[in-house]
Amino acid sequence: TTSELATHVKDKIDEWNIDNIYIDSAAQQVKADFAYDYDIYCENAIKSVNDGIAALQVLIEKDNLYFDTEGGAHTYSAMTSYKWNPNTEKPKPIHDWCSHPCDAMRYAIYSHQKMSNISVYA
């Protein structure tokens, strides 16, 4: 439920001192509920697929992306299993079990970089 999710998000905000939360622009009702009912404010994620993936690849190649392989085992497994569809004209990732955790990482990392004016290429 939204209430359970909000409680979990608030716990993580407090535990990790989180300043920014990015949300899929398709989840506007959740964004509104979070703000109105739970005082959790989210920004719409920048959802550029190829640019976001490229930003993550740079962090990985530079060894600047840390995974808690115990607490983040599912996300780590998804990131290392992510595949591109070889049967499309334009580069497009395969939509499978990896998609949601990888999209969440992409949204968070790329949105934070762009909105904070941080360059991963420096």
Spans of features found by a protein language model:
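Mg2+-dependent endonuclease catalytic cores in nucleic-acid-processing enzymes, primarily RNase H-like
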Residues: 1-94, 115, 120
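Charge-patterned, long linear interaction tracts outside catalytic cores
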Residues: 95-122
